[in-house]
């Protein structure tokens, strides 16, 4: 909560400067252990209100933060991006045979749960699971049963996020971590996003001032090679849409959910998604 207080203070400060700068205050998610991790985040963002009246997914965090970055960094409670030995431990949990595919299934299921429950505005480093072994056989041939199952889950998550207008983070940090020709999302995921008419946002995932904007030129070159010609960004939004009108959030959610579900089932779920 100290973070929110300081962030809001700086948000106001920069907005009123002569050459004002728009600052958005957000938070990044985790799904270490289902369902407790997301339960804890929802409770933190809404306090006792969650116990009395559950907040529909599109409105989680409204009034507390300006946006949510939906990320997954753990599989079955084990970090996959901390260091290589820990990643290998996560991989070994799934056995030596088809270990990569099994880990990927677990990751995508954890990601999907997070998407369903939180509807984050930004999807963080979609294919973070590739960090320490980007050339591994993550994606079996689509002509095999394993390959079709993986592809279906990838498309499931991408179509769901695209259908409500999420932005997929194009994250330059993989370059500073040793990747050469691509970053998050890698080519396979990026092309699935583009086919779904998903939206991309630019991010450096900086953990300090020395990383701000790092490798953006390389990201630009990568995106141009892959046929990307536009990027999206967030702007300040409102609080709960009917908080001052006596409305019911569940009714507001239900009114838009049918259209979202129809988009999700289409080949291009992001085409007419809300902005």
What residue spans do the PLM features occupy?
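Active-site metal-binding loops of divalent metal-dependent hydrolases
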Residues: 29, 72-73, 126, 204-206
């Amino acid at each position: 909560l100290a973070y929110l207080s300081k962030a809001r203070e700086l948000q106001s400060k920069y907005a009123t400067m002569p050459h004002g700068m728009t600052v958005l205050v957000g938070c990044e998610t985790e799904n270490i252990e289902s369902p407790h991790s997301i339960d804890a985040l929802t409770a933190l963002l809404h306090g006792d209100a969650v116990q009395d009246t559950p907040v529909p997914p599109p409105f989680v965090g409204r009034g507390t933060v300006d946006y949510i970055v939906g990320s997954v960094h753990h599989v079955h409670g084990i970090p996959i991006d901390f260091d290589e030995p820990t990643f290998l431990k996560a991989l070994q949990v799934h056995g030596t045979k088809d270990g990569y595919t099994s880990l990927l299934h677990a990751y995508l299921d954890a990601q999907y749960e997070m998407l369903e429950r939180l509807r984050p505005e930004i999807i963080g480093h979609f294919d973070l699971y590739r960090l320490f072994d980007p050339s591994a056989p993550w994606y079996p041939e689509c002509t095999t049963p394993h390959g079709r199952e993986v592809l279906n889950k990838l498309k499931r998550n991408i179509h769901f996020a695209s259908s409500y207008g999420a932005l997929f983070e194009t994250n330059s940090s993989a370059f500073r971590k040793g990747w050469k020709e691509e970053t998050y999302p890698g080519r396979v995921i990026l092309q699935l996003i583009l086919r779904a008419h998903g939206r991309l946002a630019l991010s450096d995932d900086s953990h300090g001032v020395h990383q701000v904007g790092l490798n953006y030129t390389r990201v630009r070159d990568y995106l141009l090679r892959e046929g990307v010609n536009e990027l999206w960004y967030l702007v300040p939004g409102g609080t709960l849409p009917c908080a001052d009108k006596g409305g019911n959030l569940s009714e507001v959610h239900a009114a838009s959910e049918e259209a979202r579900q129809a988009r999700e089932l289409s080949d291009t779920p992001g085409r007419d998604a809300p902005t």
